[in-house]
Regions:
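N-terminal loops that bind phosphate or other acidic moieties
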Residues: 1-124
Length: 124
């Protein structure tokens, strides 16, 4: 009733932000997008930031890599359209340890370095 009374419309948070930032314009010349979140699973495709970024990138056929501290249900993430899914954690690690800023920064840097080296190897 409030929406009708105020002549407003309902919009998800990520859609509001992407629209405000003119994200579609900003990525027009991108060859690849790398995005991330703490935990990636089937819920990622239900409106999380990474999925909003993926939706916009797919409109322009830009591949999207997803990095996350924890990954579950990779089949649904690939089905959604992510081109690659990578875990920041180098192996089994407690949630407490994985959230320590120094641990996260070290392993995120390691992972991004590996991804960049892989991309360089396949550059034509």
């Amino acid at each position: 009733a409030f929406l009708a009374f105020t002549n407003a419309r309902l919009m998800s948070g990520i859609d509001l932000i992407l629209t405000h930032l003119q994200f579609g314009k900003r990525i027009q010349n991108a060859d690849l997008i790398i995005t991330g979140e703490g935990s990636a699973d089937a819920q990622t495709t239900m409106g999380k930031v990474a999925y909003g970024i993926l939706r916009e990138a797919r409109k322009q056929n830009i591949p999207v890599l997803l990095v996350a501290g924890h990954i579950a249900d990779t089949p649904s993430l690939y089905t959604a359209g992510f081109s690659g899914i990578f875990s920041i954690a180098p192996g089994p690690v407690t949630l407490e340890k994985s959230m320590h800023p120094e641990f996260a920064a070290t392993h995120l840097q390691r992972l991004i370095t590996q991804i960049c080296k892989l991309l360089q190897a396949f550059r034509v």
